[in-house]
Every structure is written in C-alpha cells, then in structure tokens.
Amino acid sequence: RCKKNTDSFYERACLEMIDVYDDVLEEHNAILVDDAIKQLSWKYDYSSQPKAPNKHWHILCGHNEEECTEAGYDWAHSIFQTAMYKYKFTEKYDVDTYLRIYMNAHTHGIEPHLHTDDGDFTMIYYPRLDWMLEYGGGTYIDGELIEYKGNRLVVFDAPLLHSAMPVSRECYQLRTCVVFKCTKVNNNV
C-alpha cells in the first residue's frame, strides 16, 4: 500500500499498516480501566498539531513503567504489556517498549486536527465500554474510519495522517483513549 511521497519521515515507514484488535483485555480488567479513566481529572489546552487552534483534554501517563506507576497509571502500562504479549508485537512490529503513554479526551465540538505522529507506530486503546456506535468519535486514519469500540486497540504507522472524529451532539459522554507512541527495537538504541 505504499504511496509515493517526498516526505522522508513518511517514507521510512512506507507500510501504511492499520491493524485493529478487539477484546484486548479480559473483561474484568477492561472494566477496571474504564472505571479508572472515568474518575480522572483532565487538563484542557492540548493541541494535536503545534500552533493549531483546536484543543482537547490530555493527560501524560509516563515515558516508562516507573513513571506510569509513580503517576498512578500503572494500568496504562499493563494495557501495553498485555497487548504486546497477547498479539506478539515484538515479532509482528519489532516493538518492545514505548516512547510515552498519554490519554486524550473529546466531547461534542472538540475536534483535533489531522496530524502525523513521531515514532514508528501509534497504538490507540478505546477504554469506554458504554460507548455507542451512534456517538461517533472513531479515528480517521489515512482515509479509513476505525469506529470507537470499548476494549479495542488500533495500531498504525505513525506517519499516517489521522485524527479523532467528531462526537455526536446527542452524546453526553467523554470520548477517551489511551495512546502509546512506539519505536521499533532497532530505533531504541
């Protein structure tokens, strides 16, 4: 699926890979994560693209297991560990760790900009188990819409253009996600 592009950052991935994994966590663990995220206090004023006007809510979890644990987000690190072993991410993506974990949140009227990410892969976990399809709020990645579904993980090449999709004004819930920015093992040196 590689397209010609003069951007060397884009071409270094050149895979245009998008993978979707459902039922990532066991049900009881997915419920615990969903409940933990619903209790958080969010900080507004984060932009998905520097110098762009649209903002959303954001929380940095940490750059490694120790930072995540110290900040009270050990469960976020556990999502990564579970998915990594369950789906053999080291073999499939050559990934064994992350650059950072953070969370984003949106409501109706809060729409991030289309952007690319640093690193080699981006992984987005959707924690809300009560999210309904008609709420919208999926993720647009390189021309493909990935619907928001609780306990789903989306993995894609970081250089692909992507954005959270709008949330319906009939939705009175906070659209939350946990994001893992990853690099290939050989790039971690």
Please report, for each region that a protein language model flagged, where it lies by residue.
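Intrinsic-disorder-associated, low-complexity terminal segments enriched in Asp/Asn/His/Tyr and depleted
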Residues: N5-D7
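Short linear motifs centered on Gly/Pro in flexible linkers and helix caps
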Residues: R1-K3, R100
